[in-house]
Amino acid sequence: MAVAYLVTFILGAASGAIHPACYAYIGALLPLVFAFIYLYTCTLIRGFGAAIALNGFILVLFLIAGEADPGYIIATVVITALAELLRKAFGYDTKKGVRWSFIPFAFSFFAYISHWWTDTEGSLAAAVEEMPAGYDQLMIPVIDNILMLIVVLVLTIPVAILAMRLAERSLKKPAATLK
């Protein structure tokens, strides 16, 4: 499941090839895939560690690849810890525990792209080096549109709730093992 999670992350990051707005806001739609991976992982890891296994795998790979900046590391640790705490509070072997813990977990991709707002100058400089000419200029209005970022972050919550319900209905056999 960790490999599927990595592939989903990579596809999310690759959406930036279309337009910077895709990269910045795809995180609101990725929970539609993350939910299936997270639910199945939670049915395999019945106690502490499902969120850590998934986000830890990505974090280690990104550290090795040089893709993990301090903003990403901090945000990932906070999101993962919150997901683990909620799952413990509501029950490791319950649907309620998985549902509640998935809400913070759903924001995992936003941790990865947080550098746009925590290190804007560095992100723009990297875009000049790594992306086609003019990409950095396309990024500026996206980065400056804080209202849209807030709207997308807020919309991630109902998307996460809906996504987990869809995952439960689609993965009936694994979901049935939860109380």
Task: Please annotate each region the language model reported.
Residues 1-49:
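Hydrophobic transmembrane alpha-helices
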Residues 2-7, 76-114, 160-164:
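Short helix-perturbing small/polar motifs within transmembrane alpha-helices
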Residues 4, 8, 30, 34, ...:
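Alpha-helical transmembrane segments in multi-pass membrane proteins
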Residues 13-16, 23, 58-85:
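Interfacial aromatic-anchored transmembrane helix boundaries in multi-pass membrane proteins
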Residues 16-24, 87-95, 168-176:
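Membrane interface segments of multi-pass transport proteins and intramembrane proteases
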Residues 23, 98-173:
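Membrane-embedded alpha-helical hairpins and interfacial helices in multi-pass inner-membrane proteins
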Residues 28-29, 51-56, 73-74, 98-101, ...:
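Hydrophobic alpha-helical transmembrane segments
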Residues 48-52, 69, 94-96:
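Membrane-helix interface segments
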